[in-house]
């Protein structure tokens, strides 16, 4: 980032850092999947029920965007926020959240759902992929109440993202929903 004249603490620096980290992780998964003789279809990178997938994902994204200020203040220690203050950050925030959502949905759902479902069934697969996803977010310092975040917010959302992937046979909607 210094070569680009960006500070890691700037919105652009944070976004580019997140993007390159997620891109590296995604590329590793795709390459190893290919070396294992699997197609991207096995990772739920496919059309599936695209209309339903995109509808649910985009509705969630619009609703959460409309509620971003109160949610950020309530759960993520946001202070003195206004649309005028956050608008300049939105392009960089979109890069960060879409990169992160694509990476996490690929790793936690794309890699495991298709391989676990034949043995565990849909519901158990949903629960088994949700537990490590939620635990992976433990220990962060960006929210004000860990119990509320994990039990009342992240756990049901993770179950919903997995359900959406299973229902639509695709990651696209869960990526957008997760980004929301």
Feature-to-residue mapping (PLM):
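Transmembrane helix-loop-helix hairpins at the membrane interface
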Residues: 60-180
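Juxtamembrane helix-loop-helix connectors linking adjacent transmembrane helices
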Residues: 2-100
């Amino acid at each position: 980032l210094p070569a680009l004249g960006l500070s890691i603490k700037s919105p652009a620096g944070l976004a580019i850092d997140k993007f390159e980290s997620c891109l590296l992780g995604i590329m590793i998964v795709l390459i190893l999947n290919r070396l294992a003789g699997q197609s991207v279809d096995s990772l739920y990178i496919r059309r599936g029920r695209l209309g339903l997938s995109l509808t649910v994902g985009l509705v969630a994204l619009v609703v959460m965007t409309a509620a971003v200020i109160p949610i950020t203040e309530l759960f993520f220690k946001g202070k003195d926020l206004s649309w005028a203050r956050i608008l300049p950050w939105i392009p960089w925030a979109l890069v960060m959240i879409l990169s992160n959502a694509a990476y996490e949905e690929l790793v936690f759902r794309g890699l495991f759902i298709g391989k676990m479902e034949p043995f565990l069934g849909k519901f158990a697969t949903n629960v088994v992929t949700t537990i490590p996803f939620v635990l992976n977010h433990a220990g962060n310092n960006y929210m004000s109440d860990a119990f509320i975040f994990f039990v009342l917010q992240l756990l049901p959302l993770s179950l919903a993202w997995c359900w959406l992937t299973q229902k639509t046979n695709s990651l696209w909607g869960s990526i957008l929903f997760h980004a929301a």
